[in-house]
């Protein structure tokens, strides 16, 4: 819940001096990216900018305090301020900020700018007291903000010092409007206007000018002169002499003498007690000061000129001038030290009554009241956890003694979930074990089950599925239905374990249950996770169309709940890319993989390994080996600099081994095979994939017998577990083994099985990646004209893809190739004496690649009759009568040139 006063522009008071010369300068702010107003405290920064902002509807105001160094809090208020300025135009950004569903501040701002691209009128955001920001993450994000904000957007920053926002760069590019303390200092005319409005009897212009010069135009000093003159009934000139040359560091003594010592005891205590509040309203004042009418007292203090300012148009919220507030808080610690804890307790209670637990925690911490802090956390900690107030929770839990946590074990559970969210898995188990050992008496069974649900999540994250399953089952046996969050966690973990064990049907059922529970209780990250798992299971079962439809539901959930910046979004676009790749939609697959990398742009590069693997796959399917090699260099660098799940390693190894196969790099394959551990089982798609990599390397090295043993066992497991996509892949690799070992009948048999199974999976690229050996077999099957209609159609599609992407490596008779061919000592004499034209060589290559006459005409952009003439001529020169004879002739030429066809 956001405090309204932090988003309200200060109210312009009637007796303030209108700074016309500075307002004229600010009137051109819309021509700059940044308007920066800097000066020490008390020079009138906020007053000036509030005057300038008056009448501007499309302006947001954000008043900072020390708590805004938490980046989640900063983001929530900043987006809320822009929402006020735009009348709710940026709803997606607002939802993401409220739910903390963004990867980083920069990614949230990127989404904001996408929405603001449709906003075409001038727009302003004022951030007051930016000097309070010390978090470098926020500074970095605001530099990003300034670089990328729309042209019609102006950021206005008020600060006591020069903020770390890349000011020099903006200044050089003339994108910075600056107002500093010299300009903010009152001139003689403004000082005269000021005194005329504040003092009952006017003073001469010369005297006013002298006083202005004495204090160097410092607005706070002028205000103190007027206040002192009114309170003490002395001349303003006397006060001015005392303030001459004073600065903020020496102001405390003056404020004691001239302000605090000149108010009655009741007002003094009111000022000191209320100063602990960063913002205040009637209810807070009543509770903290004991005054019966807080609003009336606030208005009275304001009338006395005691540095109190309204924070909103309704006059409900007030705050002290920062300089005066800081002074009062310091005096409060000295004068009311014994009462201070009780004052903070009263403030915490009032904030709680108004529904602001974060502010209440701030005061409970200041009071050092562990019992109050404990009670607030017991009632509100999980809500704060779900809103990602993690830093505040961590600070609060550290402030509680361990004995207090043991007496309230749900707080131990909260601390453990905090550790889990930070991937501190070993610490989670240590903490829970210590708590179970030291909790006095019999531990509540439900709480023990919640501990086990969390332990199960830690175990699966840490790659220990057996322990995860045991703990998840224990948790589900003991958890009441009302304990929905832990039940969702345990059900999800159990489903994931069954997925790892290859029990796909039961795993799918549990993930569907997880989705249903998570949607019902608005636990959106688990709803998304369960959909991703369902899609992976359906893919493994060979139901790729069902997997596609599940992914569509996941994309819709992301859109509805603004989950675009969760790291899980990358998982979804990655499995979408895998599916698109399988269907040979390579451009879309590559785009999905790149969007996954974009989602992870603010994370460690190692997180991008899976998407980078997919980019390599796309290059390999296209036959673009140069690009694949470049991407593999980066991939292998990442592999050497991180720890990865076996699934990630298997996918990365897959593209490496395929690349070695396509380039004939037996040395790399042999070295990899020597050092790669062989999995103990093959009962899920991760392990099947790594065993398949091993078999592919063995085939490349001519180790056909061990490769056949591996593949037959993989097929047996895949059939028993219904891992149909893996079975389809295994059959294709077995086909290559049989083909290369000369067992042509066996090769044809398993290829027919693979084509039939592809009617279910829709696989295309898995065939294409096998290149020319696959193309030769498909040509033969097509020419036999015995394939069923669906298999015939798929074979033709696969052949077209191979021709499109792999022809240049095997069958593209370009000028360089032809020149080398004609100079070969074994070239047939007929070709030497009746050489083909360059066009006829191209036609021969396309015939060899399986193109029909119409397809050749389309490829070469000539008429079909012209192609017939070329074919007739080349048949005559080659001494052949039929297309199949031409194909065999081309194959002999390629073999002669050393191509393994």
Swiss-Prot record:
Locate the HTH luxR-type domain: which residues? 829-894
UniProt binding sites for ATP? 39-46
| Function recorded in the entry | Positively regulates the transcription of the maltose regulon whose gene products are responsible for uptake and catabolism of malto-oligosaccharides. Specifically binds to the promoter region of its target genes, recognizing a short DNA motif called the MalT box.
HAMAP family with a match to the protein in the record: HTH_type_MalT
The text of the family note is: Belongs to the MalT family.
Biological process according to GO: positive regulation of carbohydrate metabolic process; positive regulation of DNA-templated transcription
Is RNA-binding among this UniProt entry's keywords?
A: no
Which PANTHER family does the record match to this protein? DNA-BINDING TRANSCRIPTIONAL ACTIVATOR DEVR_DOSR
Q: Which NCBIfam families does the record match to this protein?
A: PRK04841.1
DNA-binding region range list = 853-872
Protein name, as recorded: HTH-type transcriptional regulator MalT
Keyword annotations for this protein, in alphabetical order, are: Activator, ATP-binding, Carbohydrate metabolism, DNA-binding, Nucleotide-binding, Transcription, Transcription regulation
Gene that codes for this?
Answer: malT
Quaternary data: Monomer in solution. Oligomerizes to an active state in the presence of the positive effectors ATP and maltotriose.
Q: Name one GO molecular function term.
A: DNA binding
Q: How is its activity regulated?
A: Activated by ATP and maltotriose, which are both required for DNA binding.
